Regions:
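Aromatic (Trp/Tyr) and acidic
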Residues: 1-119
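Glycine/proline-rich low-complexity spacer/linker segments in large multi-domain proteins
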Residues: 67, 158-179
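Short strand-edge motifs at loop-to-beta-strand transitions and within beta-strands
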Residues: 100, 140-144, 152
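Short beta-strand/loop motifs in extracellular/secreted proteins, especially
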Residues: 111-115, 123-125, 152
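Short, hydrophobic/aromatic-enriched beta-strand segments in well-ordered soluble domains
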Residues: 119, 151-162
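Solvent-exposed beta-strand/loop surfaces of large extracellular or lumenal domains
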Residues: 122-147, 164-167
């Protein structure tokens, strides 16, 4: 809920119940799937505020050669790169949609910048610059170098196939990309 008075300690894909019952979890009490302020243990309430700044500070790293995008989320980056002010804006609905767009909003001169991208697990990634494919890959980090100009558009296209997963209890889950 918006006031954080109802969350689950243990979330299960395709869960059909949120109740107090003995389960086969080795380290979770019987109320672990129940919604509340502090179900099972109070760590969520105590630590919830830490996630947002940690998530934000790990979206993109500046390197000696350019920028490395590690996590995909709407953001704006304004920094000096080799003495040149660079402003990048990312817009995306990833992982719910398969696209992300990074626009070079402002840059002085025409510096060569290396752009690196982490390929999320269970996906492959294709990168287009101004509509032309420049690199693709299905694991690790993929990268390209370009002399950038204001207005350049970098598009990330994530291929996220739908797969089925058989769980240890023989139930089946569906996975689409990282979801």
């Amino acid at each position: 809920t918006k006031d954080y008075m109802a969350h689950q300690y243990v979330q299960q894909p395709n869960a059909i119940a949120a109740n107090r019952i003995k389960r086969d979890f080795f380290n979770v009490r019987s109320d672990g799937t129940v919604y509340g302020l502090e179900p099972n243990y109070g760590c969520c309430t105590a630590n919830m505020h830490q996630g947002f700044p940690k998530f934000t500070e790990n979206l993109c790293y500046k390197t000696d050669e350019g920028f490395c995008f590690m996590v995909y989320s709407p953001c704006s980056i304004s920094t000096l790169f080799k003495g040149v002010r660079v402003i990048l804006n990312e817009s995306t609905d990833y992982p719910f949609k398969n696209k992300s767009k990074i626009v070079v909003e402002s840059v002085s001169g025409n510096p060569e910048i290396k752009f690196s991208f982490r390929v999320p697990q269970y996906t492959s990634l294709e990168v287009l610059v101004n509509g032309k494919k420049v690199v693709s890959g299905d694991k690790g980090i993929i990268a390209f170098k370009k002399k950038v100009e204001a207005g350049d558009v970098i598009e990330l296209l994530f291929d996220m196939p739908l797969t089925t997963v058989v769980n240890p209890d023989k139930s089946i889950s569906f996975r689409k990309g990282t979801l």
